[in-house]
Amino acid sequence: MTMRIFPLTACMSSLPIPPSGSVFARGRTSTATTALRFCVLALALGPALASRAATPAEMKLIGDWTVEVTLKEPRAVTARLDVAPSELVTVTAEKHDALPLFNPRTGGWMKGAQLRGVRAQETTTPFLLDPDSLVLRAGPVADAETFRRGEDYEADLSWGTVGRLAKGRLKDGQPVYASYRYAPLRLDAVVLTRDAQIVLRRGEGRAAAPWPPKVDAGERPLANVWLPGRLAKLGPEHLFPILETAYPESPKPTPAPAERLLPRTMKKLRSGEPLRILAWGDSVTDGSYLSDPARERWQEQFVARLRERFPRANIELVTEAWGGRNTASYLSEPPGSPHNYREKVLGAKPDLVVSEFVNDAGLNPPQVEERYAKLLADFQGLGAEWIILTPHYVRPDWMNLTRERDVDEDPRPYVAGLRQFAARHPVALADAARRYGRLWRQGLPYSTLMLNSINHPDARGMKLFTDALMELFPDAP
């Protein structure tokens, strides 16, 4: 690995010369040479050092809802902060024009009508509904006919969906009024104010993707406190001290991965020859759920940043995406179907394929090798180069996780398989999973980036894919 070269003038003028007794000045090395070495070391480590937060705050639970926060530098400050417990929101007589038949054989968010208080993008957020609170009536008033669960209707009380039963009193097309309570998600912020006080700012409760409160100019965010819906008390897993302000980018090797693994792509980016990029994936690549897909999808951000870095680039972006499906789905589609692999993927005749398939996450390493080796052979037959994106993190229980902090290492066999495949074959790997695994160090539970509370990243999450992709390319054209 070759270190990038940085201009040293600013470093030499701003860094103090190490004292003669320091570890950097031992032996016969001259003071000037020592300072130069110190500069090179600082610049080489710069991206990683710059991402680290100033001395992180220490957090300790001293009660069910009380947190002691200590900051030792630049001046020792300690505060005891009382966190407001999860707030129950009461909904009265929410009208549903009709209920579908309850379907027990599908995902919880699809079993029936979705209660609007717990609704996320496309789905509902589980475990927000108070399961003892749900009442369905025939009218909006308290003395209206009340329906009975198990006789007239059924509900998934974890996911907040309700549907009528065929033999019950609820008829097809009959309006129903739902009353219930739920606890929204919330992210509170611990902040160091301009006058060096540690305070707690309460976040806004939302059914999905809550943001931490804004921090004013001159203030420093120290931590976030995560309230994932109904919660009896805080635990260590709810405390997110800010350890890093950004992902710690490593110094790039020379040559950059794209120069080794994507030489034809690099040549076209630099020369201005037409470059067709195919973004191939599932609903995350489709991205139609975003507020501004034309700007926020990972592939749109990627192409915009390529054009910025390579001013002569002449890029055509093609997207082929199929929500809820995976690579096997494409390979199984018959000719003439909207998502036939040979017609829609190979038929696009891309110069560069960038694939994203979180829905392939059920594959183990041998299955990855078998499936992806076939894809690689097909792409090589076209003369196309390939970047594989590792997937984002999804619902913790879908990843066999019990928390959203201390999760640097992705536990999914699929991700291990992708890394092994890329190490064995001439393909580039954009490891977005590593970036998701460190979000907790930035004070963010990764699920707060999921608009559907499951696996649909928002624009911030899309940027993590783009950051991983751009890591492959040299910084200068």
Over which residues does each language-model region extend?
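Catalytic His-Asp segment of secreted/periplasmic serine-dependent ester chemistry enzymes
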Residues: P253-T254, A258, H392-P477
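Polybasic, proline/glycine-rich intrinsically disordered low-complexity segments
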Residues: R206-R260
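Solvent-exposed loop/turn segments at secondary-structure junctions
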Residues: S283-G287, W322-A328, V358-N364, H392-P396, ...
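Serine-esterase "nucleophile elbow" of acetyl-processing enzymes
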Residues: T254-A321, H339-K349, V353
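Internal alpha/beta domain cores that form substrate/cofactor-binding pockets in large enzymes
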Residues: L278, N314-A348, V353-S355, D360-P391
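Extended beta-strand solenoid/passenger and fiber regions
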Residues: A54-W159, A166, A183-P184, A189-V191
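Bacterial N-terminal signal peptides
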Residues: A35-A48
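N-terminal secretory signal peptides that target proteins for export/translocation
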Residues: M1-T34
